[in-house]
Amino acid sequence: MEYLPLFANLRQRTVLVVGGGNVAARKIQLLMRTGAHIKVVADDLCPELARIVNKKDINWIGKLFEPAMLDEVFLVIAATNNTKLNALVYKCAEKRHIFANIVDKQSYCSFIFPSIVDRSPIVVAISSSGKAPVLARILREKIETILPMFIGPMATLVGTWRNRIKQHIHNIAWRRRFWETILNGRFAHLISQGKWEHAEKEIESQLYHYQSPIGNVALVGAGPGDSGLLTLRGLQLMQQADIVLYDYLVSPEILDLVRRDADRIYVGKQAGKHSMPQAEINSLLVKLALQGKNVVRLKGGDPFIFGRGGEELQAVAAAGISFQVVPGITAASGATAYAGIPLTHREYAHSVIFITGHQCDDSSNYLNWSLLARSNQTLVIYMGVIQAAVIKKKLLAHGRALQTPVAVISRGTLKDQSVIIGTLEQLEMLTIQALSPTLLIIGEVVKISCEINWFGKIIKEQ
């Protein structure tokens, strides 16, 4: 983030604009909507600025800029075609720690103007950090078509009820949930129909019948990593959460989509490294929900595929707590799709089997290796890097060919995705450089990746 979006209260604050042309006029017209006390410094004014000055809406200083003019100024804008003057304004402002914007000279800007959608008091600001102003304008136009004109008056009406709601509902999280119910329900529908009195009565009715909320748990699959693969329902619940418990496999891009004010607890589950035992996670989910909170349990991939989501919900259900499940795209589906490897194919694989490397211990008889070694199927192994030698040994012993195609996919669907292709004979070598998380794909379908890979590069070992 190159620029932090801030909303400045300019009411009754002094803003100095250096320049009297059309560009300065456009900036001043925007500033006038904020209630700022505006001074313009210029030896001459364009017709529009002259009209504004004549109406006594702004103060005109008809002389050359002097550094002393920045005294008692909150921020300054320079919009002249004199590069030396613009530079002087910026340097003087910097020396006084005053925000400055030099039009069309980004290196001389301590703040920049965004594209604005004004539905006051709702204001949306869009910025490209000065890189693509036309793109920012196009985005603004799209948002203009989405936001109804009544959204501003609706926000004003809601504001008149805030103190009363605070007095009635003291818990911040419960109060937020009350407003979510109001704004997503009949109230908003009545506003859209222009029935303002009925809408206000709806708030009053909801408040009169208000009861303390009951907590719940949402088990949400975050998908394999790419934030674009998160489900819409998962995003909605993450935006409504009071608290989120998340794992190691949840990408930073996904976490950025969680509601800003939601508490976050890392319960990192990584092969051999559990920051919190499973029993404690189960207990924590129950404890938080019993406090009346909206709890989101966020897991990488799909929570019901090697995610122990079932165990967690058994504990929640046993406590009588309401819950729901939002499936996610499991790593086997997401990572192989991004690597151009179809899990099934009419010519090469009629079935697919998912297992984890934890089950592949050399001394374990848990797995049916004869079944896993069959041809015409795809074998996907989660967390299999540590057991690569055992996997190779077992599959070869039960009939899989040395030249069976193998893919090692690390950090699937992410920008730094790595796909290394070789054969079963090379499996241990292929996994040496693998970054976590890693999937092993074993089967003839791997050959197709060279034809339909579309994301990132594939390294083919000889």
Swiss-Prot record:
Query: What molecular functions are annotated in GO for this chain?
Result: NAD binding; precorrin-2 dehydrogenase activity; sirohydrochlorin ferrochelatase activity; uroporphyrin-III C-methyltransferase activity
For this UniProt record, give its keywords in alphabetical order, as a comma-separated list: Cobalamin biosynthesis, Lyase, Methyltransferase, Multifunctional enzyme, NAD, Oxidoreductase, Phosphoprotein, Porphyrin biosynthesis, S-adenosyl-L-methionine, Transferase
Q: Which cysteines are joined by disulfide bonds?
A: none
A Pfam family hit: Sirohm_synth_M
Report residue spans for region: Precorrin-2 dehydrogenase /sirohydrochlorin ferrochelatase.
1-203
Binding locations of NAD(+)? N22, V23, D43, D44
Q: Which biological process annotations from GO are given for this protein?
A: cobalamin biosynthetic process; methylation; siroheme biosynthetic process
Q: Which SUPFAM superfamilies match?
A: NAD(P)-binding Rossmann-fold domains, Siroheme synthase middle domains-like, Tetrapyrrole methylase
Instruction: Cite the binding residues for S-adenosyl-L-methionine.
Output: P224, G300, G301, D302, I305, T330, A331, M383, G412
Job description of the protein: Then it catalyzes the NAD-dependent ring dehydrogenation of precorrin-2 to yield sirohydrochlorin. Finally, it catalyzes the ferrochelation of sirohydrochlorin to yield siroheme.
Record-linked PANTHER family: SIROHEME SYNTHASE, SIROHEME SYNTHASE-RELATED
Q: What is this protein called?
A: Siroheme synthase
What gene name is listed for this protein?
cysG
